Amino acid sequence: MIINKKRVILFVFFALILLIAAVAVWFFQFNPTGYRMSVSCRASFEKISDNVFVNRNYAGNRDDIAALIDEAIARDTDFFGSLVCRDHTVIIICDDEKLLAKLGGDHDTQTVLFPVKKSCISVSTEYLNVDVLAHELTHAELHERLSGKALRRIPTWFDEGIALQNDYREQYSSETWAEQTDNGKHTVAHEDMDTGAEFYSGTKEDRRFRYLNAKHDVSEWLENHGLQDFMNLIDRLNGGEDFRAAYGS
């Protein structure tokens, strides 16, 4: 009986090790978030500066990447006053379609909270411009300033609305908003774009219209409240206050 018990314990022990190993392989090899987190360890990518990586066979000019990132950082620094996210943010530039599929996006930011908070930005050459980089870095900065609990509770329209403040593309301009909403007569209610499932659903035009509304609404809030109130809002959210109560006051 003692021998059988030892065998059972050993079997369970090794089964757990195999299970953990299998989960780790799945996460880092087949899950986009895990794949991004492990880019620094992959032979398919190379580091070109601190926390900036490109696929090894990248056909573009690496100096152009550095210049665009510097411009985006300057834009975001002007907005926030300073950036605290850079040490915990990885930027991945990729022009390989197969690798982009593994990264799970060609112009987006994924933020993980465990074991430490870290944002991984993936951008393809199609979207490699200062507006997209500034947009994604704004996500990373906002996520860095918010606690994990507060980050999970903010609505998607607010997250995107803040990021769009540093995205100057014409498709999200105030003139475009006025034209497409008939000067605000036809807009999207906040409660209809609270979640990612709501915000990113539908056609490209549907999503773009929500982006447009999110930018306009957050722009108006910032004009009425200013940067200091925005920073106070972050503090209040980190303190556990309900988003709608804090944002509406």
Tell what function each PLM region has:
Residues 18-40:
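Membrane-interface motif at the C-terminal end of an N-terminal transmembrane signal
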Residues 45-62:
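Acidic/histidine-rich, surface-exposed loop or edge segments in extracytoplasmic proteins
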